[in-house]
Design a protein with these regions (language model features):
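Acidic, Ser/Thr/Pro/Gly-enriched interdomain connector segments
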Residues: 198-204
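Short cysteine-rich clusters marking metal-coordination/redox-active sites
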Residues: 206, 212
Length: 212
């Protein structure tokens, strides 16, 4: 991929990674180099799942994006952005539907409320994500998420509103199988969505503590 951005960029490296902190890397350094060489790989030897770049409005990228050179154009083409320089690494224990909901919840709180797409549209997106993580979602809701997300990107007035659907749209594109598990099977493979979990007592291990 052609690299047009020059110089260096500071990132705040965080999440499920061995070495966290502020790093400065030359433009063109790949995500793989940052995560595995500078970041020391995934904590506990667990499997890499996603990396979100650019702060709360950035997209979530997958293993297929790890060799993407870091610069403005390439991150944008991959469905994320440079943004504020945040870089959060996720592993197999993270639910991508819940991740999208987490970031959107922040955006809803930060919206100034001036334009309808951001003020109302993002609230509708959040309602749909809450519905899905609570086990009440349908496949039609996934289509609504995608359509509404694109409308918000195209019609919001400022950068916050225009980029706010990125976590939703990128996880829908890259982790659609997880969304389908939530709405079809009512399961969360990462076991993060509590409404989709069931609990049983193992009589052989129970000590009668009455805490569960």
């Amino acid at each position: 991929k052609r690299q047009r951005s020059k110089g260096t960029k500071v990132f705040a490296l965080a999440g499920k990674i061995n070495n966290v902190g502020l790093i400065e890397v030359p433009m063109g350094t790949t995500l793989r180099e940052v995560i595995y060489e500078i970041g020391g790989g995934i904590k506990g030897g667990k499997k890499f799942k996603a990396v979100q770049t650019g702060g709360p409005s950035g997209g979530c990228l997958t293993e297929k994006h790890l060799d993407t050179p870091i610069d403005f154009d390439n991150l944008l083409a991959a469905g994320s952005m440079m943004g504020s320089g945040g870089m959060i690494v996720m592993d197999e224990d993270d639910c991508m539907v819940s991740v999208a909901r987490f970031y959107l919840d922040f955006t809803v709180e930060e919206s100034c409320g001036k334009c309808t797409p951001c003020r109302i549209g993002n609230k509708r997106l959040l309602e749909l994500l809450n519905k899905i993580t609570e086990g009440r979602g349908t496949e039609k809701d996934l289509d609504t998420l995608a359509t509404l997300g694109r409308v918000i990107k195209d019609t919001a007035l400022c950068g916050l509103g225009q980029t706010s659907p990125n976590p939703v749209l990128s996880t829908l594109d890259n982790f659609r199988d997880e969304y389908l598990e939530h709405v079809r099977d009512k399961t969360c493979r990462a076991k993060q969505c509590k409404s989709l979990l069931t609990y049983t007592i193992n009589p052989e291990l129970c000590i009668g503590c009455h805490l569960c």
